[in-house]
């Protein structure tokens, strides 16, 4: 195979805000299934940078730790992301290896992959809690060199940590530009080594150069 195509997960293959909304819906049902407005109230608190879980604890008595646990362990509703598996399969059909590098809790990230129906499509998955280090640690990327392909691509979104290691390792780094919904801001004024070599507005644009 001539290329290894490695993706970030949050705000690349799936929007983190959609995971948050899915979790909030599940928590709202658990906390007060009779209150149809609780979900919107939680979003209002979040958007106003209030501590959502502390507010729920104060109003309903559920502990912050219990709420965090449900947030991290729930299986999200990602029905709107049917196109992700089709995208990955296109790369497989082109003869590419595909991989994932993501930071976070193992159960949380694996539940996202299962909800997307893509866990089994990857040739290699690196999740920080399982692997023992987070981006931008080069080891999280170097492990893909065992696939021994000519070219390596990393597609992510976070200019603070996604592109530093692949740039240093000679990979081709690609940034999916923020459509206004990302959790983390993108800073293109950083040193060049932190910045992607290419930018795209849609993942399907990858097929124009891979």
Language-model region placement:
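N-terminal helical cap/lid subdomain that shapes the substrate entry/recognition surface
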Residues: 2-82, 86
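Conserved SAM-binding loop
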Residues: 13, 98, 154-155
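Short glycine/serine/threonine/alanine-rich loop segments
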Residues: 33, 62, 96, 150, ...
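Substrate-recognition element of Asp-dependent hydrolases with the DxDx(T/V) motif
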Residues: 66-77, 84-116
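Generic enzyme active-site microenvironment
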Residues: 6-8, 101, 155-156
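Conserved Rossmann-like nucleotide-cofactor binding loop
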Residues: 12, 19, 106-107, 181
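Asp-based, Mg2+/Mn2+-dependent phosphohydrolase catalytic module
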Residues: 1-2, 89, 108-210
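Conserved functional loop/turn residues at catalytic and ligand-binding sites
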Residues: 10-13, 95, 117, 170
């Amino acid at each position: 195979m001539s290329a290894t195509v490695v993706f970030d997960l949050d705000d690349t293959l799936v929007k983190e805000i959609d995971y948050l909304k899915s979790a909030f819906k599940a928590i709202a049902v658990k906390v007060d299934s009779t209150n149809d407005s609780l979900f919107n109230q939680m979003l209002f608190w979040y958007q106003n940078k209030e501590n959502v879980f502390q507010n729920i604890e104060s109003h309903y008595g559920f502990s912050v730790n219990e709420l965090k646990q449900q947030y991290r362990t729930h299986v999200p509703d990602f029905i709107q992301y049917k196109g992700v598996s089709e995208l990955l399969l296109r790369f497989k059909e082109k003869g590419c290896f595909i991989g994932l590098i993501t930071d976070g809790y193992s159960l949380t990230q694996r539940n996202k992959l299962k909800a997307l129906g893509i866990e089994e499509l990857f040739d290699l998955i690196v999740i920080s809690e399982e692997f023992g280090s987070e981006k931008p640690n080069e080891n999280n990327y170097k492990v893909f060199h065992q696939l021994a392909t000519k070219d390596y691509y990393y597609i992510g979104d976070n200019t603070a940590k996604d592109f530093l290691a692949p740039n240093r390792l000679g990979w081709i780094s690609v940034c999916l530009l923020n459509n206004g919904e990302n959790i983390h801001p993108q800073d293109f004024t950083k040193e060049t080594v932190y910045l992607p070599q290419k930018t795209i507005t849609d993942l399907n644009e990858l097929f124009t150069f891979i």
